[in-house]
Amino acid sequence: MPTMRNSIFSEKVYPILLSAYRWYLRTPERSLEEAYKAALNIKAIEDEHFNGNKIDFNSAIYSNSVMDYFESDLAQELKTARMRLTEFRFSRWFSNESHQKAARKAGIEYPSSTVILEKLKFIDEIISKYIITDYEIAAPSGASDLQVRTTSLQPPENPSLTDSLRNNDINKNNLVERIYTPTSPPQLIRPRTEQNKKPRGKADTTGILPRSILSTIGRLQIELDPNSEQDVINNFRQAQKRSIISIRFILLLIIVPLLTHQLSKALIVSPIFNHFKKADTEQIFLNSEMEEEALSTLHRFEERIKFENLISNAPPLSAEAIETQIKEKAEEIAAEFRGESANAIKNVFADIFSVGAFIWLLLVSKPSIMVLKEFFDNVVYGLSDSAKAFIIILFTDVFVGFHSPHGWEVILEGLSRHWGLPANRDFIFLFIATFPVILDTIFKYWIFRYLNRISPSAVATYRNMNE
C-alpha cells in the first residue's frame, strides 16, 4: 500500500508540484515581461494614432466613441503594467541567492541586469506620461491647469484686485459645479481657495467694493465667457467617468472576493483536502453542537417510527425492522454531518484566499479608491438635510440600536457555523456588550466633529428627528 501511494505521488503529484515551483521561480521574469508588453501596446497606440505623442483625450481628431475606445485600452494596459510591476517588486524582494541557485538547477535562466534595466526604463517612460491621469479624474471639478500654475506665483500688491480676481475665479468654478451637480461638498472648494495661505483678519480681506458687487460682476463675466460651455461639458464628462469607475470598483470589491472564494474552494482547497483526507479516520463532528444536533435528529426519527408503528393499521414492525431503519438514518445523518465538517474546514482556507484577493484589490486600486471617495463625497453631500439625517438614524438604529444585539447574535452564530466552530455564548455576549458601544461612540464623534462643521443644518435635523 505505501509503495502504491509513493508511485501515485511520483507519477501525478510530483510533476504538478515541480511545474508549480518552476512557475514560482519564473515570477519575476514573467511579471516584467507582461508589464513590458503592456507598455509596448501603449506605445503602439501612440505611434499609430497620435504620431508618437501622448494619448490626448481632448483631441479633436477622433470622435468621442473612438476616444472612449482608446481610453479603455489605455486604462487596461496601465492597470496591467502597474500590477505586474508590483508583482515584480514583491517577487524580487523575496528572491535571494538560494532562489537563483534553485532556478539554475531547474534549468531557468534569468535575463541579464542590462536587459531588466532597459525594460524598466522603457516602462517608466511610458507610464510616467499618464501618472496624473487617474488623479485628474479624482480631482475636484472645476480645478483647471491655470489655477494650479497660479498658486506658485507671487500675489499682486493690490489686495482689492487680488480678491476680485479670486472671487471671479471661485464664482466661475461654483457656477460650473452647480450646473452638473446640485450641491458640492464645501471641503472640495476650500482647498482651491485656502490651501497654503495663512489666516488673515477682516481688515486684510476688505476691498474697495462690496463682495456682492464683485460676485455679480464675476457671474456676468462667466455668462458672457464663450468657454463656459466647454467647461461645463468637461466637468460633466469627469463626473461621468467618476461614476463609472466608482460603480465598477464597488462591483469588483463584491464580485472578486466571492468568485475567489468559490473558485479556490472548488479548484484548490477541495482537491487538496480530498487527496490528503483519510476516510477511515475522518472526523464526523467538529464540535459538540453538531453532535447534539445529530443525536437529536436521530432521536426524533426513532420516536416518529415508534409512534407511526403504534397508530398504523398495518402489521406492526418487528424490532429488527425498526433497528434497520434507525441504522440507515444514522448512516445518512453521519454522511450529512461529515460533509458539513469537511465543508467548514474548506471554508476556512477559501475565506483566506478571499480576504487575500480583497486586500490585493485594494493595494492595486489606489487611484480607484480616490475616485470612489470623490464619488461618495458628491453623493452624500448632495443629499438634503432630511435625507442625511434619515440615513444616519437608519444606520445607528440597525447597528447600535435597541434591537441590534439580536442581529449581531445571528451574525456571530452564522459565522461560527460557517467555520465549524462552537458558538461561544460568553464571547458573543461580550462582543455585543462592547462593539456596538464603540461603534456608537465613533458615530457620535463623526457627527459632532465633522458633520456639525460641514452641515450644521443636517445635525439639527438629525436631533429633531431623533427626539
UniProtKB/Swiss-Prot annotation:
The chain crosses the membrane at residues 249-269, 352-372, 391-411, 427-447. It is a multi-pass membrane protein. Residues 191-203 have a biased composition (Basic and acidic residues). One of its GO terms (cellular component) is plasma membrane. It comes from Trichormus variabilis (strain ATCC 29413 / PCC 7937). It is found in: Cell inner membrane. Belongs to the CemA family. The lineage of its organism: Bacteria, Bacillati, Cyanobacteriota, Cyanophyceae, Nostocales. GO terms for molecular function: proton transmembrane transporter activity. Residues 183-205 are annotated as: Disordered. This is Proton extrusion protein PxcA. Keywords: Cell inner membrane, Cell membrane, Hydrogen ion transport, Ion transport, Membrane, Transmembrane, Transmembrane helix, Transport. The keyword DNA-binding does not apply. Required for H(+) efflux immediately after light irradiation to form a rapid H(+) concentration gradient across the thylakoid membranes. Together with PxcL, contributes to transient H(+) uptake following dark to light transition. The keyword Cytoplasm does not apply.
